[in-house]
Every structure is written in C-alpha cells, then in structure tokens.
Amino acid sequence: MSKYEFIKIEKKWQEFWDNNKTYKVIEDPNIPKEKRLYILDMFPYPSANGLHVGHPEGYTATDIFARYKILNGFHVLHPIGFDSFGLPAENYAIQTGTHPKKSTEENINKFKKQIKALGFAYDWDREIRTHDENYYKWTQWIFLQLYKKGLAYAKEMPVWYCPELGTVLANEEIIQTPNGPKSERGFHNVEKKYLRQWVLKITKYAERLLNDLEELEWPESVKEMQRNWIGKSTGVEIDFEIEGYNDKIKVFTTRPDTIFGITYLVIAPENKLVEKITKDNFKSNVLKYIKQEELKSDLKRTSLEKDKSGVFTGSYAFHPITNVKIPIWVGSYVLGTYGSGAVMGVPAHDERDFQFAKKYKLKILPVISKSGKNEILEKAFINDGISINSPDEFNNLKNSEVKDKVIKWLTKNKKGKETVTYKLRDWVFSRQRYWGEPIPILFDKLGNAIPLEKNDLPLKLPETANYKPSGTGESPLSRIKNWVNVKDTDFTRETNTMPQWAGSCWYYLRYLDPKNSKEFANHKKIEYWMPVDLYIGGAEHTVLHLLYSRFWHKVLYDLGHVNTKEPFKKLINQGIITAFSYQKENGVLIPNDQVIEKDNKFFDKKDNKEVTQVIAKMSKSLKNVINPDGIIKEFGADSIRIYEMFMGPLTDSKPWNTKGIIGVFRFLNKIWNLREKELSKDNPPKEIMSQLHKVIKKVTEDTEKLNFNTAISAMMIFINELSKYEKNYLNIFKPFIIILSPYAPHLAEELWEYIGETPSLFKNSKWPKFDETLIIKETKEIVLQINGKIKDKILLNKETDEEELKEIAMENSKIKSNLFNKKIVKIIVIKNKLVNIVIK
C-alpha cells in the first residue's frame, strides 16, 4: 500500500499553482456581473510571531467558498496583502533594535511562507503592503480628498496620550479597567493631554452610516454595535440663560416632557464656561474635582453606575419657561464632546439624577405621576403618566401631550429647537509615532495648513535610526530637521503620522488595480468588482476598521471615485479558536509548560496540586499558542484545513485539540488508500450511486451556506460507504474528488492527476450536479443521546454498522461539545434507532 506522502504532494501542487498562476484573475468584460464574485479576508498584520492556528480559520473558509464558486463557473477575485504599518511593528523594532522597515519585511516573508503552505487560492499578483510607498501614496491622496472636502481639520484638543507607546490614541483604542484607563494595545497607563491633532469629521456621515446598515447582510450583533456606537438621539436643544452673564448653556434632552422637573444643571469639566462662571469661593473645589476626574475614560465617566459625582459652581441659570433659578454643577459624567456638553437634572424622573440629588441633597420635584396626583417617591418614576406640578397650560395632560406642547412653546419663543445628536465623535487621526504614513500637509510661518499637490506624492517616510518615541508627545519625525524644514522655503512639514487604521480603510480597492501609478484604482475595474460580496474577519473590528472603512468609502462615493455606497455587502465573523489552559483552585491560569498529566488528571509542577483544564484564548503568556507549521509537518495542510472547518460552525468559538486532527488525517488516508483498488469504468451499483448524489447534494447545499462542518461530516460518511466496495468506480470517484477539492485541494489535485485528468482541477472541471431521482430514500433517523438525554437527530443509511454509528456520533458537534472534560463509561448502540453515550 503506497503511503500518503502529504508533504511531497502539497509541495508539488503549491509549486504548480505558483508556476502556472492558477488563481490569477483578470477582468473579462464578457463575464456578466452576476457571475463575478469578490471574496475577501481581513488582511493580516505581519507580527513577529507568525501565524497561529487561529489565523487560518477565516482564510480557509473564504478559500473553500472561492474554490467552490470557481468550480461553479464564477469569476472569483480572492486577493491577499499585509496591513504592515502601525504600532506593533514599531514596538517590536524598539524591543529588538531592528528597524521597523527591516523587521516588517522579514515578518511578511515569514507570513507569506506560512500562508502559502496552507494552499490558499490567492492571486498573489495582487499582493499589497500598506507600508509600500506606491500604496501609501494613495492613502495620502485620499486624506487630501478628505481635507479638500472639509472633512479633515487640525485642532488643539484633550486626547488620550500613552507615555509607554509615545502616542495619542483614539477613544476606540482605550479600555477601562478597575485600575483606570489603559491602552488597548499593550495595556499601558494613559493620561489626558492637550495636543494639536488631525481629526476626521466622521460625524458628518453619522446618519448615513446608521441608515445604510439596513442594506447590509451583516450579523445583527455587529450592526447593533455600530448603531450603539453611533448613538443617534432625537430630542430638543434648550437654551438656559445664566444669571449675571450673557452666555447660555445649551442642553440636549430626549425628555422635554420633564422640563418642569429640572432642579439643577450639570456641565462637563471640559466646558469652557466652567472657568468663567465658577464663583471665586467655589473655584478651589471645582479645580480639585476636575483634577481628580480627568484620568477617567469617557466609558468610565458615562458608565451605567448610578453613583455619579459633581461639584457646585456657585452660579445659577434660569428655567426657560418658568424663569426659576437653577443651580449649575460640574460633573464628569457629562462629556464635553457629546451633544452640548451639558445636561439637565430631573431627579424625579431619571434614576441617575435621583441618586445624584439624594447624594448632594438637591430638590426632587415630580412632574409626572401614574395617577395624576403627588405621590411619595422612593425611586425615580420613569414611566408614562399624567403631568403634575406644572404651569396650568401644561398640567393634567398625558406626558406625550406635554412633550409636543413644550417643543412648540420653546420653538415659538426661540428658547429651543428640535434636533438630533450622536454619541459618535470625530476620529482623532494623528499618531506621534514613526512607523506610519506621513500626513501630506505643510505649514507656513503663520501656522496655516497647505496641502501637498498630487504630483508631490508620495510624501516618503524619511529614513532614520532614531525612530523611538520622543516621550514629550512630539513625533520622532520632529527630530529630523532637514525633513521637517522644506528646502528653500519657509514651510515646515506636519510631523504626526496617520494611525494604523488608515491603510486598512481602503485596501480592498487597491486589490482591484495594485500596480496603477496614476490613480488608486481604475474606475472600470472598481465597477467590475465592487462591492465585496463576502468579507470574513473578526468581530473585534466592529467599531474600528469596519466603521472607518465605511466612512472613507462613502466619501469616495460622494466624490465619484467608487460606484457603491457601501464596501462590504456580506460580512461573516468567524469564531475564535481557543486552546486548553490550566486553572489553579484560586482561579489563576498558569502556563501550559508548568503542567504535567498523570492518569488523565493535570497537576502544577511547582506544588504538585491538581489543576483544572479550562478553555481560554491563546496567549503567549499562557504558552498555549499553537503554531500551524508543526501541525502541517505532522499531518499536512489539507488536514489542518479540514480539521478547522470540522471543529464546529464557522461562527462559533471552539477549542483546538491536536488529538482531534488525527481523525481528519485518517479520513484523508482512507481517501488516498482508494487508489489501491481497481479503478473501474464499470457502471457502479445503484446503492453507491445513490450515496454519491446524496453527498453531492449535501456538500453543495452546506458549502453554499458556509456550513462546512456538516459538509465534511457528509463526506466522511460517504467515504466509509465507498471503502466497502472492492472496486473504485471512476464514475463515483471523479465527482467525489471535485467536491472534496475546495476542502483538501492538494490531495484532490493529486487524485485528479491519478485518474488521468489534466491539472489543474480548478481550471479543468465543473462542480457535479446531483440527481434527486437517483437518491434512494432508504435512511433512518438516528437519535444521539448523552446519559439518555437527546442531543441531536440525524439521518443515516439503514446499513450503517455499529462501529460507524459510534464514530459518527463521536464526531457530531452537539455531542462533542458536551463531552469536554467528561469520562465516557460506555457507548450503547441500537441499530437504526439510537446511540447513547454514558458519561460521568
């Protein structure tokens, strides 16, 4: 029996695909739009660690779908590139003393080697790298379009600054912890600092970013996260005059029906009125409070915790309708960047305001009650009801009627107006780091910004050995004086660089025309391919990359550079591949290399105490990161591809278990060993012909729906049936090779050649069609149980034997998920009825 030499086979076909450019695609105008597909992965950041087994999950999913569609006659664009600018490369360079350009190139080469070893059907002629001058030239050009459209501006503003990273971070890059705000990357301390920043007016597109979500085939959870991040509120902006000042405080509210219950106002610490209106004898308290609160993140300040703090300014405002004096407070739970930076306190009808009023002994005035009468309030009344304690024309009415009357009164008397606000803030676009796109702006002596012309692009990132952060908040570029000061002029260059999100905002467009030196992409090529039909990547990018790229795309659409309103038609978030970790009794996770196994139990080497096996995210500190290189060497790329898809539904998180790949490897060996049988051109028995059409149907339907795990399960069942026959029937084997090929392309190509066909299979075959009339309906419903409780029901061939039933049951995803950390006592099989797995 000839051995399944997967290393030799995979190397052979990877070289064949490369040499013959099997997956190269060009724009053929004769192919109709409905037969074109743009399938895309979120491109990787080339870290020094290389790929781990979690990376190929999404790539394998798009690869299977792309190959399946190619075999179904579709013209498929499936490109790859590298998101190679940004903080991680620079931090790695600082740690190792290797220039980021050199280390990035080395890491890309490592990633490419690993990606190619997995046999993905990428068109490598379209490869892009965001740090390449010919790429970031167009990133800079798009920034200039934003600037010319009035969507990019520079301003002094309070921003999050990370001393450790040496740069400003956007709100989206800050996470709140019990120990204060931290940087998302590196988990470092951050502080507030006033710096001149470039900002993009994403808020101008808030309404469209919100409304156009309805047109997208995206997970509802992702759409909801974007809706919440954009945070649209419809209400009224009310003007409050300040006693003794000509200034007004503008307050936005969605509850104008509670206006007569206002007993205080709160303004944000950043509000410029704070310094002006705070009375002298209150100033020290106010300044102390602001200093105390300034390190809290926006998320912490606006969290749902009811215990909010504040301090009185000593000043008062006038109620716009009743003219009653209202005390003005400063409170950090109000953000200067959201709405008008002020809120009205209505403690009788808002739980947060109620707690605030109780804490500071402020008046609580109910103006709505269920009965229309005064009632003792033990907590805020937030429901609909009848108005009370209000001026006559507003009293004894449903609160919905009061709302309408108040809006009309405020509008008529020019004390307020209906308006819409958003939580979304403009995007802080500057970074005080070296490894990023230089911002193509000059400044004259007066500080006026002057955009570079197109023919001055790219503004190249200057070479320097001194790329470390300055520590002062200035960019490392500011130290390169002969670059900052433009020769023979009085102009100076902007020294901040763009954030790492800049290059990823539009990369999907550059794939369409990566070698174009005259424009970012030819318009005809954009019309040919856009939008992206299927985009697969992690949900962690919901309010960063996915929101930013939608914004840039809409700007390009408005300028006539792209033909679609949205870049990504359908989005799928793959689940996280986790790994086994080990937890001590006190809940602490310990590194995997600190654990030993004895008699199916796990112990800490240091103290010999038993630990519990748990599932956790892969991390270097836990030493549970699994590199695919070793897996490929031991089992092959086709094995890892099929195993990752077989672990469970694509969108579910699931734990990696290297033992699980052995079953997949056996499956591929079983297919390979069919070569040992006579390859017969005889007509196959009707039973196996029926099974063939059944598996073609199942794999077709499941692959179309991205249900790869169940498609693989069907192929495994079929191969068990096919292996029972003495002959290997060509009319059976050939179509099976084709349906296997998206999943195990290397093995499929080898078998395609073995049966005498011309490679590549992906150029010289078509996806087989199933014939319902040939499918014999001799199946039985088998119940799968654990300890007598039904977990799943499946249809199987009546002739499936006991051992196969056991194997199928054990590989069932609903059964597998219930067996984690359990001991199997016995497996009871009743043929054509049930499989019951007894565990303890």
Curated annotation (Swiss-Prot):
This is Leucine--tRNA ligase. Keywords: Aminoacyl-tRNA synthetase, ATP-binding, Cytoplasm, Ligase, Nucleotide-binding, Protein biosynthesis. A motif ('HIGH' region) lies at residues 44-55. It is found in: Cytoplasm. Disulfide bonds: none annotated. The keyword Ligase applies. Its EC number is 6.1.1.4. GO terms for cellular component: cytosol. It is an enzyme of class 6 (ligase). It catalyses: tRNA(Leu) + L-leucine + ATP = L-leucyl-tRNA(Leu) + AMP + diphosphate. HAMAP family: Leu_tRNA_synth_B. One of its GO terms (molecular function) is leucine-tRNA ligase activity. GO terms for biological process: leucyl-tRNA aminoacylation. Its main location: cytoplasm. ATP binds at K620. It comes from Borreliella afzelii (strain PKo) (Borrelia afzelii). Belongs to the class-I aminoacyl-tRNA synthetase family. A motif ('KMSKS' region) lies at residues 617-621.
